[in-house]
């Protein structure tokens, strides 16, 4: 029953939705805003940057909260799936979860630098870990995702595939200056 739950179409769609929509549309334009590509009526990009860069501003807090809400769901599904017997469905679920966790941390670390690294969910207050720890987890999760998804094809063009994992690995290596 647990495997059918975490591998169900509804659960899969919800995971995809949380990762994409949780951080809100702000996360998609953040680099343009803080990179000086957009500006206010004053014609100076710095005015926009100064008004949006407050940690309490919805622009920042909605991204942070959205990514961590998605991460909590991914970690929860992963903890359930890890306790199940080995099967192609289990491996697909774990591969997708590891991919999503890597993607979430890639987004977090490139936007915020040092972030709390949560390998499993906790109720405890957590502090920020060095960005290097987040990058290590991203690389580790992508390697694990490759292993879990190896030999499996995506159910649809829109789902995580081994090629998607390879593409995200390439992006990570570019960020880290690795070959």
Q: How would you label these PLM feature ranges?
A:
Residues 1-7, 12:
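Single conserved hydrophobic/aromatic residue that forms the stacking wall/gate
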Residues 93, 158-165:
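Short, conserved alpha-helical segments within structured domains
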Residues 119-122:
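Outer-membrane beta-barrel translocator domains and adjoining extracellular loop/strand segments
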Residues 135-137:
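N-terminal propeptides
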């Amino acid at each position: 029953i647990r495997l059918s739950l975490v591998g169900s179409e509804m659960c899969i769609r919800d995971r995809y939705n949380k990762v994409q929509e949780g951080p809100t549309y702000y996360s998609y334009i953040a680099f343009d805003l803080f990179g000086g590509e957009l500006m206010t009526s004053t014609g100076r990009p710095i005015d926009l940057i100064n008004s949006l860069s407050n940690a309490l501003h919805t622009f920042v807090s909605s991204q942070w909260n959205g990514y961590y809400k998605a991460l909590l769901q991914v970690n929860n599904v992963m903890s359930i799936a890890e306790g199940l017997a080995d099967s192609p469905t289990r491996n697909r679920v774990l591969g997708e979860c590891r991919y999503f966790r890597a993607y979430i941390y890639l987004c977090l670390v490139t936007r915020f630098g040092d972030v709390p690294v949560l390998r499993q969910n906790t109720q405890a207050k957590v502090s920020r870990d060095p960005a290097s720890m987040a990058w290590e987890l991203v690389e580790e999760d992508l390697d694990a995702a490759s292993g879990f998804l190896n030999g499996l094809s995506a159910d649809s063009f829109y789902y995580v595939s081994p090629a998607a994992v390879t593409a995200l690995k390439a992006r990570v290596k570019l960020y880290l200056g690795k070959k």
